[in-house]
């Protein structure tokens, strides 16, 4: 670990982690300025998405980050919920059932809105045991 990565992790957990219990979802949004402030390198945000899944009852965790050239999404899930399907259908991405990535050419705010607008489509799957 670098000191910058540890500081970014602390900042994210304290200030940026959002929880939507009605969707059993946690998400993090990071701006380009926030990534720059912590001297974030590619890969520094990779493990952050997993913190959301460590919260009791959470089945979907997403990090949305502004990488200047586009907006990147990293999606992780527990159980049978397929983040691969969500990433492929809505975020030009894909991967595996429980780990996927995506991207958009929308703004950061538009991407967050799209993610929040898409969640209700998956509510039944997310709240199923």
What are these regions (language model features)?
Residues 1-90, 95-129:
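Hydrophobic helix-and-loop "lid/oligomerization" segment in the mid-to-C-terminal part
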